[in-house]
Amino acid sequence: MSFSLNFTLPANTTSSPVTGGKETDCGPSLGLAAGIPLLVATALLVALLFTLIHRRRSSIEAMEESDRPCEISEIDDNPKISENPRRSPTHEKNTMGAQEAHIYVKTVAGSEEPVHDRYRPTIEMERRRGLWWLVPRLSLE
């Protein structure tokens, strides 16, 4: 017994869905539908570029403003600068044999407390760096 299927279509039939005997032309609407995502993607790309340019300009302006040295009167008038200085004009690199400078800040309560220098490692970090030779050398061989 042999079994075979024949999938040939007669010449007058099409493989398109049945539309009730009416022919519709979907050409221009399909082209417009395909162009909408492209337009949306282009608009998003332009918005992203505009946002990046705006952020870069504002950060450059803020950087130029912060590079200006502070006057003494500005430091005294602004409690944020006097409590947490970003850059101390008297700060020098620590050289061997140089004395440490102690900076005290008057708090809101009126007491004076030393300010931690964020650019100088803490005593614990210096102690850890001094004991580097105690760490065993591990090899991956």
Curated annotation (Swiss-Prot):
Location in the cell reads: Cell membrane
Q: Where is the composition biased (Basic and acidic residues)?
A: 65-94
In this chain, the stretch annotated as Disordered covers 61-99
Q: Which domain of life is it from?
A: Eukaryota
Which Gene Ontology BP terms does the record give? regulation of oligodendrocyte differentiation
Its main subcellular localisation, reduced to a broad class, is membrane
Which residues are glycosylated according to the annotation? N6, N12, T14
Does the UniProt entry include the keyword Transport? Answer: no
Expression tissues: Brain specific; expressed in oligodendrocytes. Expressed in oligodendrocytes in remyelinating multiple sclerosis plaques.
Q: Which residues lie on this side of the membrane: Cytoplasmic?
A: 51-141
Q: Required for plasma membrane localization: where is this region?
A: 77-93
Transmembrane residue ranges: 30-50
Q: What are the record keywords, sorted?
A: Cell membrane, Glycoprotein, Membrane, Transmembrane, Transmembrane helix
Q: How does this chain sit within the bilayer?
A: Single-pass type I membrane protein
User: Known InterPro entries for this protein?
Assistant: Opalin (IPR026609)
Residue spans, topological domain Extracellular: 1-29
Chain's role = Central nervous system-specific myelin protein that increase myelin genes expression during oligodendrocyte differentiation. Promotes oligodendrocyte terminal differentiation.
Return the PANTHER family for the record: OPALIN
Spell out the protein name for this chain. Opalin
Species the sequence originates in:
Homo sapiens (Human)
